[in-house]
Amino acid sequence: DFDHIVFVPMHKKKRRERGFNQAEEMAIQLSKRMNLSVIEAMERTKNISSQTKQEKFNRFSRSKSVYRSLSGRLKENARILLIDDVLTTGATLVACAESLKRNYACHITVLTFAFTPESGEV
């Protein structure tokens, strides 16, 4: 059981350019089926270049300072379903989960809709 759904945020500039955040859209559709509220509890504070070409170590170090949880959005110890579109190294989800746990001491379950295997795994 979950209290809320939280999605991985996109930087405001990129969101304006694209017109939508795919993780948010997935969260909204899932919330309708699960009868849960979607809470915008995170923000992306930096508009860094895409991490798709970065090595695993670089992704983790770059992601740490990019995501911030917003205060007053969730109750403490909430059970959160954290949504992202694609899992590659896990750096984004780890950064978001750490920020949420640090500020809300919440319980987090992660759901992604795709996985990018490392080369040679397929």
Where are these regions (language model features)?
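Conserved PRPP/pyrophosphate-binding segment of the phosphoribosyltransferase/PRPP-pathway fold
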Residues: 1-81, 89-122
